[in-house]
C-alpha cells in the first residue's frame, strides 16, 4: 500500500513565521535601499569621500556636502543602511555606527571627476545608470506591471509597461514627447552602461580582437568603444553605426569612421561586426533581423568573418550575480521589448539567423563575449 502523501499545506513553525515576517518587511521595503542609494548619489557622497582622501567622517560629509548640522543623526542612519548593503564600508567598525566611511568598489564607480567630468581615474562614472534606474519614470512603469499583465494584448511583442504608462519607447525619438531632461538622463545612462567594463573586455578578452582587420560597432554611440579598440589594436579600422540623431555631425577623424543608418536595414561591411549590450533591448524576432543583417555584412568564416556579441548571459551561480541578471531581465521587461537570455536562448537566435557555430568567453562575471561564425 502506497504511503500517505506528505501534507504540503502544513503550517509553518513559529520560528519560520518570524523569519518570514522579516523577509516580508525586507521585500516590501527593498525600494527604500534603492532610494537611499539614489540619495547618496544625488548628494554626491561617493565623490566627497574620494576628495577627502578616501575616508570621511560624518562631520566631514556634513561640511563637504553643505548639509544642515541638524541632519547629522539622519545621515548616520542613511549611511548605516548603505554600509550594510555594500555601497560604502565602515572605516572604524563593522556597522558604520561610529561614523567614518570609505569607498567600496561599488561606490568607486559613482565618483565624479573634477568639474562633473564623467570619468575618474580611468573608470567611467555610473551615476547616470543609478539616476535612470531610480527615476520616477522607470519606477512608475514598474508600478504598472500588474495592470500590464492583466491586459489582453494579442501581439507577440506587446508594448512595454514603460510605453503604456508614458506613451514613449525608451531610446526612441518618441522620448522627445516627455520632458527633455528625461530623455537626456536615459541616454546618459545608456552611454555610461555601454562604456562600463569595456577596458576589462579589451584586457581579458583580447584574443577576440586579434587578427581582425576591420570592425563595425553597431549602435556604437559616441565612438568611445571604437576608439578604445583602435588604441589597443591600431591595425583595426573601425566604423561606428548609429541612428542619425546619435551620429549628428560627427565625422571620421582618421581613427574612427561614423555612419548614420539603421542596423535593421543595412550594416557597413567589415570583417567583424560588434553588438555590445544591444540585443537585450530587442525581442527575439528583432534580434534575428539584426543578426541577419550582421551576417550579410561579414565575409565567410575562412576569411575571418564573425559577429562579436558582448551581453548578459543568465546562468551565474546563485548569489548576487544571478540576482543582478534576473533583476536586469525584469528591468528589460518593464522598459523595453527585450530580455536577458541564457546560453540556450542565444544559441537559438544564432541558429535562426543562419549562423553555423559560436564560441563563448566567460570572463566578465554577469556578462560574456560571443564570437558567432557564419
UniProtKB/Swiss-Prot annotation:
Entry EC no(s): 2.1.1.-
GO MF: O-methyltransferase activity; protein dimerization activity; S-adenosylmethionine-dependent methyltransferase activity
GO terms under biological process: biosynthetic process; methylation
Pfam family, one: Methyltransf_2
Binding site residues for S-adenosyl-L-homocysteine: 242, 262-263, 276
PROSITE patterns with a match to the protein in the record: SAM_OMT_II
Expression induction: Induced by UV-C.
Entry keywords, A to Z: Methyltransferase, S-adenosyl-L-methionine, Transferase
Catalytic residues (UniProt): 280
Domain of life: Eukaryota
Stated family: Belongs to the class I-like SAM-binding methyltransferase superfamily. Cation-independent O-methyltransferase family. COMT subfamily.
PANTHER family reported for this sequence: O-METHYLTRANSFERASE
Record-given protein name: Flavonoid O-methyltransferase-like protein Os11g0303600
Organism expressing this protein natively: Oryza sativa subsp. japonica (Rice)
Amino acid at each position: 500500500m502506497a504511503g500517505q502523501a506528505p501534507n504540503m499545506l502544513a503550517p509553518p513553525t513559529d520560528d519560520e513565521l518570524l523569519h518570514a515576517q522579516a523577509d516580508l518587511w525586507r521585500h516590501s521595503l527593498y525600494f527604500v535601499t534603492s532610494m537611499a542609494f539614489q540619495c547618496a548619489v544625488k548628494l554626491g557622497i561617493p565623490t566627497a569621500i574620494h576628495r577627502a582622501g578616501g575616508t570621511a567622517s560624518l562631520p566631514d560629509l556634513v561640511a563637504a556636502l553643505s548639509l544642515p548640522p541638524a541632519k547629522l543623526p539622519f545621515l548616520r542612519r542613511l549611511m548605516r543602511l548603505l554600509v550594510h548593503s555594500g555601497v560604502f564600508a565602515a572605516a572604524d567598525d563593522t556597522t558604520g555606527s561610529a561614523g567614518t566611511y570609505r569607498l567600496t568598489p561599488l561606490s568607486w564607480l559613482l565618483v565624479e571627476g573634477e568639474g562633473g567630468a564623467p570619468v575618474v581615474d580611468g573608470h567611467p562614472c555610473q551615476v547616470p545608470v543609478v539616476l535612470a534606474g531610480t527615476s520616477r519614470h522607470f519606477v512608475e512603469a514598474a508600478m504598472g506591471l500588474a495592470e500590464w499583465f492583466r491586459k489582453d494584448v494579442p501581439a507577440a511583442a506587446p508594448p512595454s509597461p514603460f510605453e503604456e504608462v508614458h506613451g514613449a519607447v525608451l531610446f526612441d525619438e518618441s522620448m522627445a514627447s516627455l520632458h527633455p531632461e528625461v530623455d537626456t538622463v536615459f541616454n546618459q545612462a545608456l552611454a555610461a552602461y555601454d562604456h562600463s567594463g569595456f577596458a576589462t573586455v579589451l584586457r581579458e578578452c583580447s584574443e577576440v580582437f586579434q587578427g581582425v582587420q576591420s570592425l563595425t560597432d553597431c549602435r556604437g554611440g559616441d565612438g568611445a568603444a571604437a576608439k578604445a579598440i583602435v588604441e589597443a589594436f591600431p591595425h583595426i579600422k573601425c566604423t561606428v553605426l548609429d541612428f542619425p540623431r546619435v551620429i549628428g555631425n560627427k565625422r571620421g577623424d582618421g581613427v574612427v569612421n561614423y555612419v548614420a543608418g539603421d542596423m535593421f536595414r543595412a550594416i557597413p561591411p567589415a570583417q567583424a561586426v560588434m553588438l555590445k549590450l544591444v540585443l537585450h533591448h530587442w525581442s527575439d524576432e528583432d534580434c534575428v533581423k539584426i543578426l541577419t543583417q550582421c551576417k550579410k555584412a561579414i565575409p565567410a568564416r575562412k576569411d575571418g568573418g564573425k559577429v562579436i556579441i558582448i551581453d548578459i548571459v543568465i546562468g551565474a551561480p546563485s548569489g548576487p550575480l544571478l540576482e543582478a541578471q534576473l533583476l536586469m531581465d525584469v528591468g528589460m521587461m518593464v522598459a523595453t521589448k527585450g530580455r536577458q537570455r541564457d546560453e540556450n536562448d542565444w544559441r537559438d537566435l544564432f541558429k535562426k539567423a543562419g549562423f553555423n557555430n559560436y564560441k563563448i568567453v566567460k570572463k566578465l562575471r554577469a556578462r560574456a563575449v560571443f564570437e558567432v561564425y557564419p
